[in-house]
Amino acid sequence: WQDLPRTNGTDKDIEKFEVKYGDMLFCRSSLVAEGIGKASIVPEDVPQNTLFECHVIRLPLDLSKCVPEYMQVFSTMEYFRRQIIAQSKTATMTTIGQDGILKADILLPPMSKQREFYAFVHQVNKSKFDTMTFAPIYDIINLYLHTHFYQGRR
């Protein structure tokens, strides 16, 4: 946090642009289509008065329906990435608006499964993810999503 750029935000700026745990931040523009809409969650330990800026789209998550750490991983899955790239526009740079992100279908397992997944992720390592470590749980989530959503068993 110490290396982040600093600014003198007004109370109005802080009210409008402050991020909190449960916010997802999406890349609004990229030189390549694959970079568009890449997302990160705001971690629980975010310092007070941390603001986002205009090159980022902020979407607050409903914490009664989803676990942010689950959504972080979901945002990297091919199912979600294809939808985001399909909603983007390319001229000199590839861009996407908040409306494009909101058009994506979000597949949410029950909160208990999301929490179970988060507990696993948290136990392995809170900040550095090893793809090979997550392969089994990633496969389980994909199987669940396929069984319950793709085959119409909502």
What do the predicted segments below correspond to?
Residues 1-24, 30, 41:
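Sequence-specific dsDNA recognition surfaces
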Residues 21, 38, 103-105:
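Extracellular/lumenal ectodomain signal focusing on beta-strand-rich modules
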Residues 48-57, 66, 88-115:
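A short glycine-rich beta-alpha junction/loop motif
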Residues 62-64, 68-79:
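Glycine- and charge-enriched low-complexity intrinsically disordered segments
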Residues 67-71, 102-139:
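Amphipathic alpha-helical segments
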Residues 130-154:
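Short amphipathic coiled-coil heptad-repeat segments
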